[in-house]
Design a protein with these regions (language model features):
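C-terminal regulatory/interaction module of P-loop NTP-utilizing enzymes
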Residues: 1-314
Length: 314
């Protein structure tokens, strides 16, 4: 049981989807166009109360899934952005040492210090600074939050090992305080860009899904949902060009996020269709490495664009 007092959890909580189709509709209603395989694993993660591990290239929409899910369910989103060197004090908890020292000095100044009682007081919730992972275990009137552990591959194996208790039992053990266990498990989404392999022990505690680049039909649906101001012809050409450029030998292929950014940029330029000069001039929105940009500029941009248009006429 949680050691934290929380708000009345009897308040109305947004219902979880009762089927895969409802999961698809929930995501679509919040502006996320998912395929059925993603909706299936998300539905199962919600029903089985298991963490969901999403792996895939940067920019394919992994983080957005957690954001959309929290919004659609009316739940709080708690995000832990991972980075190299992330440790327990930044991700889970730390003690308010200044407050503890002040309490000790005041007690000693008053005389007759009960050491056991003083120790219990300074290691109480009053002096516990709760970080993202600990906050996610607390009761919430709006229902269990969505906990996003984003880009786990940026951390090290020691931090992965610490996460095992949270992902398997939804609890954290604090040596001076005790075990804090969620009364109702949070909805946990873990993402990785696969810059390194994540240990099997962590993956076994989660349901797994590889988030791939969308096919042309789904990417067009995403573009129309996120950038409805883009002309229909331009939207089709953008998607066809991006789909084609992903087949090229690039250091980093553009993700869906770059597709949307490019569409927004082209709309700002009052474009109604692509042309080679426009493509070359705006490649910096779509591609993020100079070698890739140089490879795709000029005659290569025209060649790809001609190929895309020829394919569209078939």
């Amino acid at each position: 049981m949680s050691r934290f007092a929380g708000p009345n959890t009897g308040a109305a909580v947004s219902a979880l989807p009762a089927s895969i189709d409802e999961t698809l509709a929930l995501l679509k209603g919040a502006g996320y166009v998912a395929d059925r395989s993603l909706a299936t694993v998300l539905f199962l993660a919600l029903r089985l109360q298991r963490p969901l591990f999403l792996e895939g290239e940067a920019g394919v929409g992994k983080t957005e899934i957690a954001k959309v899910l929290a919004s659609a369910l009316g739940r709080k989103l708690i995000r832990l952005q991972c980075y190299e060197g992330l440790d327990v004090s930044s991700a889970v908890y730390e003690w308010n040492y200044a407050g503890q020292m002040m309490a000790i000095r005041l007690a000693e100044a008053g005389g007759g210090v009960d050491r056991a009682r003083l120790e219990g007081d300074v290691f109480s919730e009053r002096y516990l600074v709760k970080r993202a992972l600990l906050q996610a275990l607390e009761p919430d009137a709006g229902g269990p939050p969505v906990l996003l552990i984003d880009e786990l591959d940026r951390t090290d194996e020691a931090f992965e090992a610490f996460l095992l208790e949270i992902l398997s039992d939804f609890q954290v053990t604090i040596p001076e305080f005790g075990t804090v266990k969620a009364e109702h498990p949070p909805i946990v989404i873990v993402t990785s860009n696969r810059t390194r392999e994540i240990h099997d022990a962590l993956k076994r505690r989660c349901l797994y899904h590889w988030v791939d680049y969308p096919d042309a039909a789904r990417e067009l649906a995403i573009l129309r949902a996120k950038a409805p101001q883009a002309p229909a012809k331009l939207s089709k050409e953008i998607v066809a060009f991006v789909q084609a450029i992903r087949k090229e030998d690039l250091f980093k292929s553009p993700g869906v996020a770059e597709t949307l950014d490019w569409a927004s940029a082209l709309v700002e330029l009052d474009a109604v269709a692509l042309d080679p000069h426009l493509v070359s001039d705006t490649l910096g929105v779509l591609l993020k490495y100079q070698d890739d940009i140089q490879k795709m500029q000029g005659s290569k941009a025209k060649e790809l664009l001609d190929s895309v248009r020829a394919e569209a006429r078939r």
